Each structure stands twice: as C-alpha cells, then as structure tokens.
C-alpha cells in the first residue's frame, strides 16, 4: 500500500468511526477466510461493519474521534467491528466468539467510554435500540387497547342479548 492509499484508508475509516456508536477490537489469528467472510456476513446483516486493518492505520484513524482511548488495544493481529447501534456489533461479536475459539474480543468502547471484554459481553446482553423502541411502543399501546376493549364490551353484550331474543322469537 502506498502513502496515498494509506491516507485514503485512514480517512475512510476515520469518517466511519466518527458516526459509530460502538467499536469493538478483536483478535482473529488463525481464522480462515471462510470464517472471516461468515463473520462479515453476520455483521452486515445486523447493520455493522467488520474490518481487518493495520494497527498503525487504525490508531491514526481513531485520532479526533470519541474513541481515541482505544489505541492501547491494537497489539498483534487485530480487527475492528463497529456500528451505529450501540448494541448490535456487541451481540454479533459475542455470539460469534462463543462458537469460534479463534475469535477473541479484546475490548471496545462507546463514545467517551473504554470497555474491556467483560464490558462488551455485558453490553451484548442489553436489548438493542429497535427492541427497546418496540417494547416502549407496546407499553404505550397496551392501555389504549384495554380501553377500546372495555368500551366495546357493553356494546357486544347488548348485541348478543338482542340476537338471543331474535332467535327466541323465531323459534316461537
């Protein structure tokens, strides 16, 4: 890679990291190309990105972002996973680490907060932003559906009584 390619890589990575809500630093030494491709596919499906980068370039790309404190994690063969959703990348990475012992989570970070591997594991157990929105919407809608049910119940009872009288009159 020549200097202009490195500068372009750093600039692209820096702009991606500026928008990220979570970054996870991983070690994946010994993983096959098929395994890395499978991990990338799972990350992409969850709305995340996974990149194997040179440590020096990753450290440079972190400068000027909210994740500058993570530069100590970049030792040895590392890769980064990042996403806008603060939980999505953690869920995929932790699930993948459970099934593949060559893949290890070194640490990660939220904007302004450095996490170790246990912190990333704890973060993966939280509900995602979409799950929180869905449960909040469900909580908001539940009282309205109960009120509608209560209001419809007397009308339904009157209709059933009238139908019973109509059947009784037809039979007589």
Curated annotation (Swiss-Prot):
It comes from the Bacteria. Belongs to the universal ribosomal protein uL10 family. This is Large ribosomal subunit protein uL10. GO terms for biological process: translation. Part of the ribosomal stalk of the 50S ribosomal subunit. The N-terminus interacts with L11 and the large rRNA to form the base of the stalk. The C-terminus forms an elongated spine to which L12 dimers bind in a sequential fashion forming a multimeric L10(L12)X complex. It comes from Rhodospirillum centenum (strain ATCC 51521 / SW). Forms part of the ribosomal stalk, playing a central role in the interaction of the ribosome with GTP-bound translation factors. One of its GO terms (cellular component) is ribonucleoprotein complex. The keyword RNA-binding applies. HAMAP family: Ribosomal_uL10. The keyword DNA repair does not apply. InterPro entries: Ribosomal_uL10, Ribosomal_uL10-like_sf, Ribosomal_uL10_bac, Ribosomal_uL10_bac_type. Disulfide bonds: none annotated. Keywords: Ribonucleoprotein, Ribosomal protein, RNA-binding, rRNA-binding. GO terms for molecular function: large ribosomal subunit rRNA binding.
């Amino acid at each position: 890679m020549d200097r202009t390619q490195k500068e372009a890589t750093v600039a692209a990575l820096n702009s991606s990291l500026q928008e990220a809500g979570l970054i996870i630093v991983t070690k994946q030494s010994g993983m096959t190309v098929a395994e890395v491709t499978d991990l990338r596919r799972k990350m992409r499906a969850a709305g995340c990105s996974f990149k194997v980068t040179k440590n020096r370039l990753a450290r440079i790309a972190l400068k000027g972002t909210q994740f500058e404190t993570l530069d100590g994690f970049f030792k040895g063969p590392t890769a980064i996973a990042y996403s806008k959703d603060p939980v999505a990348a953690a869920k995929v990475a932790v699930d993948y680490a459970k099934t593949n012992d060559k893949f290890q989570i070194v640490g990660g970070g939220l904007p302004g907060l450095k996490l170790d591997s246990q912190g990333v594991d704890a973060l993966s157990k939280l509900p995602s932003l979409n799950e929180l929105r869905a449960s909040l919407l469900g909580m908001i809608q539940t009282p309205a559906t109960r009120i509608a049910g209560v209001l419809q119940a007397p009308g339904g009872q009157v209709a059933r009584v009238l139908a019973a009288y109509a059947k009784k009159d037809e039979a007589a």
